[in-house]
């Protein structure tokens, strides 16, 4: 099978609504782009928990502390789930989980820039949760039908849990 035929077969699978798995043949650009996108998503989930975790000890009530701790735990878990499936996809590129994380420290991997903003007040924490999680629900729900099967499956869980954060 020529490269053009493999690409045509790959695109036909996507057009039929089939899901692509990590072990399936895929064009190099599809793999590289997906790794970069999922890496950014994973790191955004993890980095998004950092400003909010600072508020756990200062939350105004025990109920708010518990709620915020659960949210931080969810966000860290989302990041770990997405990073795990990114690891499988990146393996044929010779990248390990350690390499993916190292990319964050070298600036090769990014995360949403909203997480660079400080949250000096409890109100900031609430607004961040409302706006950022609201946007996450909308943007991630749009990706539920992703052609990459592992990502689509993880997003089902992530989207269900993000809905509780608003």
What residue spans do the PLM features occupy?
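Metal- and O2-centered redox machinery and metal/ROS homeostasis
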Residues: 12-20, 28, 52-58, 69, ...
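Extreme N-terminal leader/anchor segments
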Residues: 1-18, 23-24, 62
């Amino acid at each position: 099978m020529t490269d053009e035929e493999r690409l045509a077969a790959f695109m036909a699978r996507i057009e039929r609504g089939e899901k692509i798995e990590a072990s399936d043949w895929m064009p190099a650009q599809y793999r590289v782009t997906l790794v970069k996108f999922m890496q950014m998503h994973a790191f955004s989930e993890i980095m998004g928990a950092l400003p909010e975790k600072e508020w756990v000890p200062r939350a105004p009530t025990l109920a708010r502390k518990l709620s915020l701790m659960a949210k931080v735990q969810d966000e860290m878990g989302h990041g770990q789930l997405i990073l795990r499936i990114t690891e499988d996809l990146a393996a044929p590129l010779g990248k390990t989980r350690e390499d993916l994380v190292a990319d964050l420290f070298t600036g090769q991997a990014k995360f949403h820039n909203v997480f660079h903003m400080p949250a000096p007040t409890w109100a900031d924490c609430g607004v961040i949760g409302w706006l950022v999680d609201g946007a996450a629900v909308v943007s991630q729900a749009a990706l539920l039908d992703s052609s990459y099967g592992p990502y689509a499956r993880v997003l089902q869980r992530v989207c269900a849990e993000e809905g509780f954060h608003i």
